Amino acid sequence: MKKIYDLWVRVSLIKKIGIGVVIGVMLGILAPDLTGFSILGKLFVGGLKAIAPLLVFALVSQAISHQKKGKQTNMTLIIVLYLFGTFASALVAVLTAYLFPLTLVLNTPVNTELSPPQGVAEVFQSLLLKLVDNPINALATANYIGVLSWAIIFGLALKAASQETKHLIKTAAEVTSQIVVWIINLAPIGIMSLVFTTISENGVGILSDYAFLILVLVGTMVFVALVVNPLIAVLITRQNPYPLVLRCLRESGLTAFFTRSSAANIPVNMQLCQKIGLSKDTYSVSIPLGATINMGGAAITINVLTLAAVHTFGIPIDFLTALLLSVVAAVSACGASGVAGGSLLLIPVACSLFGISNDLAMQVVGVGFIVGVIQDSCETALNSSTDVLFTAIAENAFWKRKKA
């Protein structure tokens, strides 16, 4: 037994997760009635979601309270990369929709409990209100905009505190980080359970009716991950970006794919940034911020499904309108984390550009929920892995400028 344990300890986490995925698929196909097994996945995701707000608050307040005057954090470049990457993803989705026009079979059931925002202004109003949320409520409800804003305020206030107080804050951040390490080490079991639940509840063939839509969505996201993002990286760093890109996809995207939660993946991303050797002053802020505004995958979902609706209803569209759609989708996607239902519930905002009624737009949302098992997984994997990628290339660019 000890030999098996020692062998398991020596195997890398990624290989363990791969083994968990294979076992989860086999159990989902061969023994779908083991419904009690799904609780392990819920516990794993619940643990990550529970610790993530505390981790963000502890790390951000600690980083800012210890920050020396004039120290570079590269946040301006990172935010520009987040916004540009989201817009580029939206533009790629428009081009994909032109090359592979989709039509949808509507009259799908719609979740009437969810209501879409009435426009981009409402999305941003919601985000601004989240900035001034009660700090305890922000932590309890995982409102990362609120957690970030209060962590920054507390960090600034703690700059004037004694060294003993700052040391206490640093210890709290280190303890929280250690708890995260323990939870992440349970990823193989948690992901095995999540894969089992997906296969046992949905089957492997349930999405065949929407195969082309899934292919377009996933293909666009893969193109952005393997072509567009590396192109952005090489323009900034002047180095081969693929070792970093593939590492981000492997160590961040893989976990995000199965948890389907950017919030749950924040601890994973922070640990990856630490392993890469990035500055904690930077990534403790950029990673939770990226989970909120870096939404390339969401922009792709909004544009692909909106243009599918446009083609379904035979509405003509010119290039300038498509460009405007990309801007609206990018801006809306940046607020996706502040909307119940995420990117899918922002589709009516984009559809309104073409005069598509809210009732019809919500039917398109219904199609999105049907393919959500795949769409949401790929979207989260792209969004979350890009947070680490853009943080890393911004820091790389800073050190190159400094050496020059």
Swiss-Prot record:
GO terms for molecular function: amino acid transmembrane transporter activity; symporter activity. It is found in: Cell membrane. Keywords: Amino-acid transport, Cell membrane, Membrane, Symport, Transmembrane, Transmembrane helix, Transport. It comes from Streptococcus pyogenes serotype M3 (strain ATCC BAA-595 / MGAS315). The keyword Glycoprotein does not apply. GO terms for biological process: serine transport; threonine transport. It catalyses: L-serine(in) + Na(+)(in) = L-serine(out) + Na(+)(out); L-threonine(in) + Na(+)(in) = L-threonine(out) + Na(+)(out). This is Serine/threonine transporter SstT. It comes from the Bacteria. It holds the Pfam family SDF. Belongs to the dicarboxylate/amino acid:cation symporter (DAACS) (TC 2.A.23) family. InterPro entries: Na-dicarboxylate_symporter, Na:dicarbo_symporter_sf, Ser_Thr_transp_SstT.
